Amino acid sequence: LSRRVVMYHLKELSFREFLQFEDFRLKLPKFQLDDLLKNHKKIARDLKQQLTTPIKYFDAYLKHGAYPYYLENRQSYASKLNQTINLILEVDLNAVENMPYEDSRKVKKLLIAIAQSAPFIPNITRLSERLGMSRVFLINAIKLLNRADLVMELYKPTKGVGALTKPEKLFLNNPNLVHVLGNQNAEIGTLRETFFANQMKHLHDIHLAE
């Protein structure tokens, strides 16, 4: 029998999953988005009976809660996450996309540029001039970073998305990446916006408002 590989897209830990790693005694139910919107006060009161300091846990989640290897050593988490990013850019892109090393270095340069400003509305012409890339290479590189779960692309709902369509707004894929690649002192609004988009995108279609 030939070997068969089942592909599975394993996303980051949710905040609920992170909490259960932090305290195995917690029994936290799942909630549908509609239920949260309609009954958020009651849900918050019920959760408060189990979880007395949610903000403390949430702050920790934003810094190191996305990937479970934080459990091995929290002090070296940022370094290990940086190593994972380098592995994706320098090894995985070459293996999957047959990308030369020099091009992977350009993609890394792009990721750093995004990290310094995310979330932001990209000016493709200005970015391509600044980074020394063609427009086509730049847009393709953004798509690759999105597929690698390093950035998120957002579009307006009325706009068609094609292979060479530039995103309306770019985010880093989760708050941990904001801390590691962008800014250790990132604004809490940026972190919360990134968190919300990350948690919603796997279960819902999210768009920029018109």
Predicted feature descriptions by range:
Residues 2-105:
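Interdomain motor-coupling "hinge/lid" segment immediately C-terminal to the ATP-binding subdomain
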